[in-house]
């Protein structure tokens, strides 16, 4: 099948066939990353703008690297350096950007729906790199790619998402993506860090991590923002780690070679024990590599690649 979308804004309504097209397109992209010369002429002359109104060196660098390998010109706008600090609205920024005639815009913003607003106003394609607590579609796609690469398929696989579900756009996007591909998703976290609407997500929810460990194929620990303790949502980081930290003892309870994942950056000793983060079952570094390949695939499709065929 071909690709007809102008933007990639969310995963929730993305059909399984389109998800799989992105993942299939990422395979040759990853091979390109292993070449001595990591550069394609595919999108020479195309311009990609990164608008990061939230700080994220890892994600921004991943997108920049992906665009450069594809041969596109990249420009980045960090909020601290932008006119927004002088009272300029997002709409003003959009109009200024439109005048620069970009081909593709990547946006990360603290407000849910910011990427959708941008897509409606711009002729250029838009990629959502995270909007508020709404979604983070490219993270879910790179997570899926990593799981498929290791497991072959996620259909029927038991996937645990552990931690701060309430504030996690990564969790939301992963739930939609994994459900679309037939995985068994279990959300695990303290009651104070589960969203009130979670029953409508259609997946199992529990406060007890240890009960769900047996038979799990993937454990994805979510980043815990340390300010959650200060806001009273957690009694202490020590207690959180005791109840929800991924330790060697807990990994043994799975009874299999369970994959250990994390969107990063990791709070070692809180979300994941260092020995587990560094173990052979951890695919955290693979997620970083696969993130570039998946973002290359998305850019390739949005900029006119249209199919999984890659031009050498």
Curated annotation (Swiss-Prot):
<dbReference type="GO" id="GO:0016597">
    <property type="term" value="F:amino acid binding"/>
</dbReference>
<dbReference type="InterPro" id="IPR002082">
    <property type="entry name" value="Asp_carbamoyltransf"/>
</dbReference>
<feature type="binding site">
    <location>
        <position position="169"/>
    </location>
    <ligand>
        <name>L-aspartate</name>
    </ligand>
</feature>
<dbReference type="InterPro" id="IPR006130">
    <property type="entry name" value="Asp/Orn_carbamoylTrfase"/>
</dbReference>
<feature type="binding site">
    <location>
        <position position="58"/>
    </location>
    <ligand>
        <name>carbamoyl phosphate</name>
    </ligand>
</feature>
<dbReference type="Pfam" id="PF02729">
    <property type="entry name" value="OTCace_N"/>
</dbReference>
<dbReference type="GO" id="GO:0006520">
    <property type="term" value="P:amino acid metabolic process"/>
</dbReference>
<feature type="binding site">
    <location>
        <position position="264"/>
    </location>
    <ligand>
        <name>carbamoyl phosphate</name>
    </ligand>
</feature>
<feature type="binding site">
    <location>
        <position position="86"/>
    </location>
    <ligand>
        <name>L-aspartate</name>
    </ligand>
</feature>
<dbReference type="GO" id="GO:0006207">
    <property type="term" value="P:'de novo' pyrimidine nucleobase biosynthetic process"/>
</dbReference>
<dbReference type="GO" id="GO:0005829">
    <property type="term" value="C:cytosol"/>
</dbReference>
<feature type="binding site">
    <location>
        <position position="108"/>
    </location>
    <ligand>
        <name>carbamoyl phosphate</name>
    </ligand>
</feature>
<dbReference type="InterPro" id="IPR006131">
    <property type="entry name" value="Asp_carbamoyltransf_Asp/Orn-bd"/>
</dbReference>
<feature type="binding site">
    <location>
        <position position="139"/>
    </location>
    <ligand>
        <name>carbamoyl phosphate</name>
    </ligand>
</feature>
<keyword id="KW-0808">Transferase</keyword>
<feature type="binding site">
    <location>
        <position position="59"/>
    </location>
    <ligand>
        <name>carbamoyl phosphate</name>
    </ligand>
</feature>
<protein>
    <recommendedName>
        <fullName>Aspartate carbamoyltransferase catalytic subunit</fullName>
        <ecNumber>2.1.3.2</ecNumber>
    </recommendedName>
</protein>
<comment type="subunit">
    <text>Heterododecamer (2C3:3R2) of six catalytic PyrB chains organized as two trimers (C3), and six regulatory PyrI chains organized as three dimers (R2).</text>
</comment>
<dbReference type="InterPro" id="IPR036901">
    <property type="entry name" value="Asp/Orn_carbamoylTrfase_sf"/>
</dbReference>
<dbReference type="GO" id="GO:0044205">
    <property type="term" value="P:'de novo' UMP biosynthetic process"/>
</dbReference>
<keyword id="KW-0665">Pyrimidine biosynthesis</keyword>
<dbReference type="GO" id="GO:0004070">
    <property type="term" value="F:aspartate carbamoyltransferase activity"/>
</dbReference>
<comment type="function">
    <text>Catalyzes the condensation of carbamoyl phosphate and aspartate to form carbamoyl aspartate and inorganic phosphate, the committed step in the de novo pyrimidine nucleotide biosynthesis pathway.</text>
</comment>
<comment type="similarity">
    <text>Belongs to the aspartate/ornithine carbamoyltransferase superfamily. ATCase family.</text>
</comment>
<feature type="binding site">
    <location>
        <position position="223"/>
    </location>
    <ligand>
        <name>L-aspartate</name>
    </ligand>
</feature>
<comment type="pathway">
    <text>Pyrimidine metabolism; UMP biosynthesis via de novo pathway; (S)-dihydroorotate from bicarbonate: step 2/3.</text>
</comment>
<dbReference type="InterPro" id="IPR006132">
    <property type="entry name" value="Asp/Orn_carbamoyltranf_P-bd"/>
</dbReference>
<feature type="binding site">
    <location>
        <position position="136"/>
    </location>
    <ligand>
        <name>carbamoyl phosphate</name>
    </ligand>
</feature>
<feature type="binding site">
    <location>
        <position position="265"/>
    </location>
    <ligand>
        <name>carbamoyl phosphate</name>
    </ligand>
</feature>
<dbReference type="Pfam" id="PF00185">
    <property type="entry name" value="OTCace"/>
</dbReference>
